[in-house]
């Protein structure tokens, strides 16, 4: 038997004792995620982040988070195949204020539209809104049978496809370049751009299922808190954006009564 000190006994504890497990959620705070005024449902969920510790500020950890929400949840409607991406841009108290960051169709919707015996037509365009957002828009559409057609297929000729694609591009540029971001989102929710394209292309070849398939935000203007608050319906007429909903619930200043001639005590160290 080896002679020497038993390290396990000298420490006064058993070898391999488990450390106390601390629940990581005790260090986190929950925040409400708010959607802009374009949507019917404003409170879209909750998110959490580690509390402020030292130089790590909680609100900075929230900015830039992207939330993907179904249109049905945002509008209390039935169009669940359209998904909107919202990005966190500002934190006011316990509220995370978001802005539009993109739109997409669900995979099952896209797959269900692609069928045999018809021509698929796609168009892409980069266009800038009046308030400085550069958007890349993708449009998709399908040919359909003419009235009283007996033939099984409904294929468009190459020159017809080119004309339809040109019309799609022109319509998207006209609709977006004359609108700000809020108006563009209001057009995307009911799918009005796709319906207008479908009507304008009827004389070239009958179309159906014409939709804006995807929208990407390529560039944004310089961030302005006042504009974001206007988008959330919190802008103020008096004193401008600075006095904003200056303060979210529970964070307003409290008036303290002081006797006349009161002077604060001088601190020895700062």
Swiss-Prot record:
Q: Where in this protein does the record put region Disordered?
A: 235-270
Task: Report the subcellular localization.
Answer: Cytoplasm
Q: Where is composition skewed (Basic and acidic residues) in this entry?
A: 249-261
Where it mainly occurs, coarsely classed, is cytoplasm
Q: Which SMART domains does UniProt cross-reference here?
A: Ribosomal_S3Ae (SM01397)
Q: Name one GO biological process term.
A: translation
- The answer on whether this UniProt entry bears the keyword Nucleotide-binding reads no
Give start-end of the signal peptide. none
One GO CC annotation: cytosol
**One Pfam family, short name:** Ribosomal_S3Ae
InterPro entries in UniProt? Ribosomal_eS1 (IPR001593), Ribosomal_eS1_euk (IPR027500)
The annotated subunit structure for this chain is: Component of the small ribosomal subunit. Mature ribosomes consist of a small (40S) and a large (60S) subunit. The 40S subunit contains about 33 different proteins and 1 molecule of RNA (18S). The 60S subunit contains about 49 different proteins and 3 molecules of RNA (28S, 5.8S and 5S).
The record's comment on protein family reads: Belongs to the eukaryotic ribosomal protein eS1 family.
Q: What is this protein called?
A: Small ribosomal subunit protein eS1
Q: Which organism is it from?
A: Ixodes scapularis
